[in-house]
Amino acid sequence: MALLHMAVTEPLDLGDGAGLSRIAKERLHVLHVNHLLRGEDADADQHFVQETCDSLGVPCTALRVDVAKFAQERDGNVEDVGRRVRYDAARELAQKLCIEQGVSRQKAKILTAHTADDRAETFMMNVMRGSGMSGLASIPRHRGLIYRPL
């Protein structure tokens, strides 16, 4: 939620080389994916996100996806499947919004709220897995449509 408040109220450095820039409020759209893993707590989170977006005047799309079921069907890890579901949904929504607004898809930016701690954790997980030199990297601040300004 911190990223949403920042995007609405102040300039952000997206790590794209453009420095600090404001995001036009009418271009913001929040995606919340409820993975259905935490019962009432997840439902409360979804409700909180939707209420916050309403109070800020930012449209919100909420999806409910049974990630545990997807993971079981695909013999996958729940975290990995959840991540793929979120990023796939974000890309699809970005494409849809670009088409609706008549904007080139290359203009789309998906902001995620990864923090420095998340990036450090990814680096340490790669070290513990025994990654070679190419694997000793953290989450990049920018990759494709994805930007991580925090």
Residue ranges of each PLM-predicted region?
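Core alpha/beta nucleotide-donor-binding catalytic domains of modification enzymes
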Residues: 1-150
